[in-house]
Amino acid sequence: MTSVSARQIDAIIERHAALQARMATGDMAPADFVAASKEFAELEPVATAAREVVRLREELVALNEMLADPEMKAMAVEEIAAVEAALPAAEHDLALQLLPKDVADSRAAMLEIRAGTGGDEAALFAGDLLRMYSRYADTQGWKVEIISANEAEVGGYKEVVASVSGQGVFAKLKFESGVHRVQRVPVTESGGRIHTSAATVAVLPEAEEVDVAINDSDLKIDIYRASGAGGQHVNTTDSAIRITHIPTGLVVIQQDQRSQHKNRAKAMQVLRARLYDLEREKLHSAEASARKSMVGSGDRSERIRTYNFPQGRVTDHRINLTLHRLPEILEGAMDELIDALIAEDQAQRLAGLGE
């Protein structure tokens, strides 16, 4: 386990106290007060964890000194055991607080689900995944808004893009990127044979205009008449938008809204998220040699999870976790899965700090 030095702990506590004292004076410019308040709030849980480590370490020193007193020795031995049992957990909690934060963790996310191998069954599975994430979002108090959807004739989706907004969305959904595989007997299968299908999930942190500089000269915008399933026109105006980002070749098509203006706004929302994600991928690649985390790799071609209907199980291959709760998970009971992925990522990053 990575141990936090006494010097680091002192620096944390001193900085927290200094910020508190400075804000209490009332002699700060509004902008400075806002900045100090933000830093103070971010430092609060770290300082609390640091003080708990200090308390336990000091208590351990005092108890060890009591061992020299014959009358106090028995009690001291018992209390030393209790403190020694509590200290590693407190130090672990502090180390977690000190891990570098992903600046995107607090952001909303763009959720993209695409049917892969398996034809109609893959499209139905893509629909099941959207429902699973939507139900999970409900349990978290998040809002899900469909940005664009290419529905399959049999049901489900060939491709669907949704915006998920709320507290800490990306932090919890970011490990969902990858290939999700389903094994089940399709409703159209008369012989009872199990088929394997797949869908690809991409979770991108939503980006603000200030995050990504997009020059109008870098965009090629095509406007045309929107069409629905089978090619029929869904309205009589040229409202569909196709935006091509020339430097990267990224293409976003948006036709779900009747208003050209709304379609353009949503297309730009998706484009910003994809460009921001590209920048994050470059940064991740640069850090890859320093941090070999399978959980956080974000490789969207990697098979990450299997949903096996005959056995009623869900297996996450990255952490070798199998849960025999498939119906509940598909209804949004994803906490156990997501918490396990977050814990494994934290463990790997802590191990990286200790190397």
Swiss-Prot record:
In alphabetical order, the GO MF annotations are: translation release factor activity, codon specific
InterPro entries reported in the protein's UniProt record: PCRF, Pep_chain_release_fac_I, Pep_chain_release_fac_I_sf, Prokaryotic/Mito_RF, RF-1
- Keyword Acyltransferase set for record: no
The keyword Protein biosynthesis appears for this protein? yes
By its UniProt entry, which Pfam families does this protein fall under? PCRF (PF03462), RF-1 (PF00472)
Where is the PTM N5-methylglutamine found along the chain?
232
Q: Which UniProt keywords apply?
A: Cytoplasm, Methylation, Protein biosynthesis
Q: Cellular location of this protein?
A: Cytoplasm
The record's Gene Ontology cellular component field reads: cytoplasm
* PTM summary: Methylated by PrmC. Methylation increases the termination efficiency of RF1.
Q: Which domain of life is it from?
A: Bacteria
Q: Which PANTHER family match?
A: LD18447P
Family designation: Belongs to the prokaryotic/mitochondrial release factor family.
Functional description taken from the UniProt entry: Peptide chain release factor 1 directs the termination of translation in response to the peptide chain termination codons UAG and UAA.
Q: What is this protein called?
A: Peptide chain release factor 1
Q: What is the lineage of its organism?
A: Bacteria, Pseudomonadati, Pseudomonadota, Alphaproteobacteria, Sphingomonadales
